[in-house]
Amino acid sequence: LLRRQRQMCIRDSIKGIDAAEKISILSSICFGCKILNKGFIVEGITNITIDDINFAKELGLKIKLLAISEKIGNYIKQRVHPCLIPSSLDIANINGVINAIVVDGTPIGRTIYEGEGAGKGPTTSAIISDISSIMVGNDDFSFGHSPKTKKHFKRYNFNKHECKYYI
């Protein structure tokens, strides 16, 4: 049973499902909105080949699965897909079970947070934190916001989405 669960977790990571769930929760925390768990692009790394990796390396780039969320006016634009990023960036060197969060905002500028995103320790820590909050009566403020104060944003229309693509 544990082996099957581990295989499912790996599959979810490769397909981008795990990253999509994490960015949905982070968007809710950052923007004070309901969790957006559908209506956005989710593309994993299953179609990345060794040739893609080698070509990126020749260009001084790395391929990373990124989960991106941004607020544009009254819209939340959320997506998960492989990206080519310069090898010199800090997040290009995040590997294994380590996850990184890059926050770019005013007035703080760009900050990076990193830590384990999988395994017994991080999962246990998150569960204990949630249980502690509920035990002290703080169950109305999941993700730092009361359900009564959650903002309603529209989902971004990806038919309007423009970006560079590697073919």
What are these regions (language model features)?
Residues 8-9, 45-63:
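Active-site loops and adjacent core secondary-structure elements that bind or stabilize anionic groups
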Residues 14-22, 43, 47-51, 98, ...:
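Conserved active-site and cofactor/substrate-binding residues in soluble primary-metabolism enzymes
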Residues 126, 131-167:
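A conserved regulatory-domain signal marking ACT and ACT-like small-molecule sensing domains
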Residues 27, 67-68, 82-84, 92-94, ...:
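Short beta-strand elements
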Residues 1-10:
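Single conserved hydrophobic/aromatic residue that forms the stacking wall/gate
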Residues 11-16, 34-42, 137-148:
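Flexible, glycine/charged-enriched surface loops at secondary-structure junctions
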Residues 109-111, 115-121:
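Glycine-rich phosphate/pyrophosphate-binding beta-alpha loops
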Residues 21-35, 130:
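Oxidoreductase and adenylate-handling cofactor-binding alpha/beta cores
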